[in-house]
Amino acid sequence: MFKPKKKIDSKLIFTSTISSGSMNGGRSETSIKRIDDNKALYSIYEQDFHSSPVVVKEYYIDVTTLDKIKEVFDKYDLQEYPKLKKSEIFALDAATTSYEYQFENGDNIYFSSDLDLPRKFQDCRVEVINILNKAIENGEKLPNIVSQNPSNNEITLSINYYYQNTISYLIENYSNHEIEIDGIIRLYKGDYLIYEEESYSYNLNKNRDHLDYIMLENRLDVGDYLLELGDIKCSFTIN
């Protein structure tokens, strides 16, 4: 028997639940991050299998949502869970789910479904889901990509997703030969350059693709944008 850890006397500032590692390569991720004294960012990322489209939904929700989740955390003594033994039952092709809780005082509690989690943990998850569903009802849904127009050439540039100030983009080589792409990555809103990064160089074999990303300092406003890499471009709309 391990000695229970004292309850954490500090504000919850971040929590996430990530499920990945299944046979089909899918991934789901939810996170809540305290932004200021009034609001938190609730982000949802879902991909059914490895090559399927990514669905992103993000909301500003009341920061008291994190306080309510902290109450559930304390109710079920989740600070004890990292010391639980690993489960003796596992499925090789099943996804693993990880849970993380970060606190203002620097404490970080992390555990996963590989552990022998007690049955009461399912009750805990139901309570958290109910809290989040109510938060969304009164939350502010944030703009995201509603349409895009990828370049239609042998070399195609398209947007994979826009998530937490990150734009993931895909370069695809439909030609029958290896190509080299060398250019500066630029992002425009209308005629205004809002992001520029040093030159990148990609070597793509025929019928291959490359996934990469850029990280922005601030969220994109509603509007029309153009992502440019050398001579290839992709326009998209945030709404």
Spell out what each predicted region is:
Residues F2-S22, Q79-S151:
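Short, well-ordered, aromatic-rich surface patches in folded extracellular/luminal domains
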Residues N24-T30, V54-V56, L92-T96, E180-G183:
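Short, surface-exposed coil-to-beta transition loops
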Residues S43-V56:
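Acidic/histidine-rich, surface-exposed loop or edge segments in extracytoplasmic proteins
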Residues K57-E58, E198-L204, L216-E217:
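Beta-strand-rich interaction surfaces with strong enrichment in secreted/lumenal proteins
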Residues D62-I89, Q164-L170:
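Charged, amphipathic alpha-helical segments
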Residues L66-K68, L115-N130, D191, N203-L211:
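Short, surface-exposed linear segments at secondary-structure transitions and domain or protein termini
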Residues P143-Y202, E228-N239:
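Primarily secretory-pathway and cell-envelope proteins
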Residues N207, L216, D221-Y225:
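A glycine-anchored, Pro-Gly-centered beta-turn/N-cap motif
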